[in-house]
Amino acid sequence: MPAVTFTVLKRDRSTGARLGRLTTPHGTIETPVFMPVGTQATVKTMTPEEVAGLGAEIILANTYHLYLRPGADIIREAGGLHRFMHWERPILTDSGGFQVFSLADLREISDEGVTFRSHLDGSIHFLGPAESMAVQEALGSDIAMAFDECVAYPASPEEVAAGVERTSRWAEACLRAHRREDQAVFGIIQGGTIPELRRRSAREITALDFPGYGIGGLSVGEPKELMYSILEELQGYLPENKPRYLMGVGSPDCLIEGVKRGVDMFDCVLPTRIARNGTVMTTYGKLVVRNAAYARDFRPLDPECDCYTCRNYTRAYIRHLLKAEEILGLRLTTIHNLHFLIKLMQRLRQAIAEGRLEEVAADFYERYNSGKI
């Protein structure tokens, strides 16, 4: 029996949106879904129980960071990532490829993998398809991602083509190396913003018959409209019966537009990162609660939100906490932002089920862009 199964429950008539169900060894996920990011085996400032209490059905953890610290062997000895961090629901791990190419001091890229210098202590490491699979098997995630080359944006067509070729070879190597039967491996489609190379990558990666597919190399600085056009381009090249995961995307508008274009899964550090900087998402747009304008504002962050933060605390109090550098301020803004996106995905799922996605999306945009904060 496969480690994961995916069922499309309903398709939207006017868009490419799908309502689905993804079953994993640690539970079932209703899609489309947003996955909070727990880079270091923790969603920053929150306990796993709190994250689950918000309705998060799956989280993401980072292979690169956990490989460097505390090390895959320690997590294996602990019984895997679920036991190590006390999270009983599904976990997806990325391959480490994006961080190797973006964070680490690259030493050498070869067909076998990447030699790099750790951003923590300068030590030299090698990570390739086999190594990435070994680390992710030790972590014991429900879904592992194939090791890929994420080419920076902008890049020349030659650089993007080389990345597509290497990503395809590495995808095959990942399948050869992977052994764990209770863990699925998703392939990753690259190709930058060049439609021809996206189509080529999609053909080559889907030919390997992974149980799911990540769409990588987007949301890296390209205009949003360009990302949307690439998603539209890919719809006809991805299997209808397998989940589609848009990597690193988490703003409300991108979630809605991704769902319309057939995406089932999303992850991003955005909601938690901007929360720690004092920015929150509300029904009527983004609110920078650190600003002096809110020093005497005794309303909740979002009067229409029912999260723990908005039920109990005011903008003035949260601003005070942030200015005083109190940890509670970071926790309260994080709770709110994650609640906001998880509730948004719940509304989108309900809208697909009821055949009202376009209507619900239009209503969201009208209010979110109104500026009535």
From Swiss-Prot:
Underlying gene: tgt
Stretches for region RNA binding: 248-254, 272-276
Name of this protein: Queuine tRNA-ribosyltransferase
Coiled-coil annotated spans: none
Cofactor needs: Zn(2+)
GO cellular component, one term: cytosol
Manner of cofactor binding, per the entry note: Binds 1 zinc ion per subunit.
Pathway entry: tRNA modification; tRNA-queuosine biosynthesis
Pfam families: TGT
GO molecular function: metal ion binding; tRNA-guanosine(34) queuine transglycosylase activity
UniProt-annotated binding residues for substrate: D94, S95, G96, G97, F98, D148, Q190, G217
Domain of life: Bacteria
Biological process terms in GO annotation: queuosine biosynthetic process; tRNA wobble guanine modification; tRNA-guanine transglycosylation
Role played: Catalyzes the base-exchange of a guanine (G) residue with the queuine precursor 7-aminomethyl-7-deazaguanine (PreQ1) at position 34 (anticodon wobble position) in tRNAs with GU(N) anticodons (tRNA-Asp, -Asn, -His and -Tyr). Catalysis occurs through a double-displacement mechanism. The nucleophile active site attacks the C1' of nucleotide 34 to detach the guanine base from the RNA, forming a covalent enzyme-RNA intermediate. The proton acceptor active site deprotonates the incoming PreQ1, allowing a nucleophilic attack on the C1' of the ribose to form the product.
The family this protein is said to belong to: Belongs to the queuine tRNA-ribosyltransferase family.
Gene3D superfamilies reported in the protein's UniProt record: Queuine tRNA-ribosyltransferase-like (3.20.20.105)
Residues the record marks as active site: D94, D267
Enzyme class: transferase
Record-linked NCBIfam families: Q_tRNA_tgt, tgt_general
UniProt keyword terms in alphabetical order: Glycosyltransferase, Metal-binding, Queuosine biosynthesis, Transferase, tRNA processing, Zinc
